[in-house]
Design a protein with these regions (language model features):
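Short, flexible loop/turn elements at secondary-structure junctions
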Residues: 20, 80, 146-148, 158, ...
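Short hydrophobic/aromatic-rich beta-strand segments that constitute the beta-sheet cores
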Residues: 76-78, 163, 287-290
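Aromatic- and glycine-enriched pocket-lining scaffold segments that form the walls
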Residues: 118-154
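A residue-level signal for conserved active-site and pocket-lining positions in enzyme catalytic cores
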Residues: 73, 117, 278
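Proteins synthesized as precursors that undergo proteolytic processing into mature forms
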Residues: 94-130, 243, 247-257
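A contiguous strand-loop segment
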Residues: 1-95, 128, 318, 322-330
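C-terminus-biased signal that marks the final domain/tail of proteins
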Residues: 1-15, 129-131, 137-138, 147-149, ...
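Short, surface-exposed beta-strand-loop junctions and turns on beta-sheet-rich folds
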Residues: 22-24, 82-84, 159-161, 169, ...
Length: 330
């Protein structure tokens, strides 16, 4: 149910990557919410954004963002947190009452950094709203980073916003973040370097290839396995000063947790798979998206023109498979 990470490159670019793993046909699209945009929460609260932002979202009883970045370089991705998130059931006086899915609008539309978000958090109250399209109140938490590379988890307890620093910069799903950090202790032996030979009863035991240092790295698609795998790979992926290669490396990291159709089949739903991958450059305020069934990357940069429009802009990019043919006999 989604993997997110944040990485800072050698040339001081901050990138947030995420997979959107789900079993409902989202048909997600890149979109822009401009500065000073008037909006109405499903709780009845009305507001006006202070900052413009771009992201990827879907029309689900109103447009819902799954991720995005604002003009100050604050970025976010939405992820499930079943069994741990708890929302309010009624409105709270003297608070901004919004739904669990509208956290993206608050964070991107009203905050300039994680520190700013922390200062505003006490003014927010999250009210549970049932979504008919998916048949539940989605239990959510959020991976949030700012232009400095600082990352946090945003979750909810009885509707109150809970912010936890996340220096490893990886977020998946349940259990809670403390559990995931503790679980990493089981994998401190995993290394990108080859294991050394060992002498056993006078016999030299050689490692099985250069990859032997990674033996024991989890390979499944549970949230616990994805967390460990992403934490290891993010920490060790080779970096250089090539901005385009940094972008490709971020997508390669996402490929390591990408779920093809047919690999995860819930009893009560269709195939659960990675519907799209997104890499967000917080430094340049650019959104890169790659959809399932396409090998193309579509890019959307947050420009002054988009920020200053009156209404939302939703893009519907075509999805293509591009193959470069080296001869004509194909």
């Amino acid at each position: 149910m989604c993997t997110g990470f944040t990485i800072q490159t050698l040339n001081n670019q901050v990138l947030l990557g995420r997979t959107m793993d789900y079993d409902y046909p989202l048909d997600s699209s890149p979109a822009v919410t401009p500065r000073n945009y008037r909006w109405t929460s499903r709780t009845g609260t009305t507001g006006q954004t202070q900052y413009g932002f771009i992201g990827t979202g879907t029309d689900m009883e109103g447009f819902i963002y799954g991720d995005g970045v604002n003009e100050h370089g604050v970025a976010i991705s939405t992820q499930y947190f079943r069994g741990y998130s708890s929302y309010g059931s009624t409105h709270k006086a003297d608070a901004m009452n919004i739904t669990q899915n509208e956290i993206v609008t608050w964070i991107l539309g009203y905050t300039t950094s994680i520190e700013d978000m922390k200062q505003q958090a006490s003014q927010i109250h999250v009210v549970a709203v049932y979504l008919n399209d998916i048949g539940e109140v989605p239990p959510l938490h959020y991976h949030v980073s700012d232009a400095t590379g600082h990352s946090v988890e945003v979750s909810f307890k009885e509707g109150e916003v809970v912010i936890k620093d996340n220096p490893i910069g990886v977020l998946t799903n349940h259990p809670d973040l403390n559990w995931h950090y503790s679980n990493l202790r089981q994998y401190i032996n995993i290394s990108p370097y080859p294991a050394t030979a060992n002498l056993l009863e006078g016999v030299t035991i050689e490692p099985l290839g250069n990859e032997a240092g990674t033996f024991g790295l989890p390979g499944g698609f549970t949230s616990t396995e994805r967390f460990v795998r992403m934490a290891f790979m993010k920490a060790n992926i080779a970096q250089n000063n090539d901005k385009e290669m940094d972008l490709m490396n971020a997508f390669y990291l996402l490929d390591a947790v990408n779920i093809p159709i047919g690999i995860v089949r819930p009893h009560d739903a269709d195939n659960h798979y990675t519907m799209y991958q997104t890499v967000i450059n917080l430094t340049t305020r650019t959104l890169y998206t790659k959809y399932y069934g396409s090998n193309e990357i579509v890019a959307l940069k947050l420009t002054d023109d988009l920020i200053n429009r009156k209404d939302m802009t939703i893009f519907k990019p075509e999805k293509h498979i591009t193959i470069r043919k080296l001869n004509d006999n194909q």
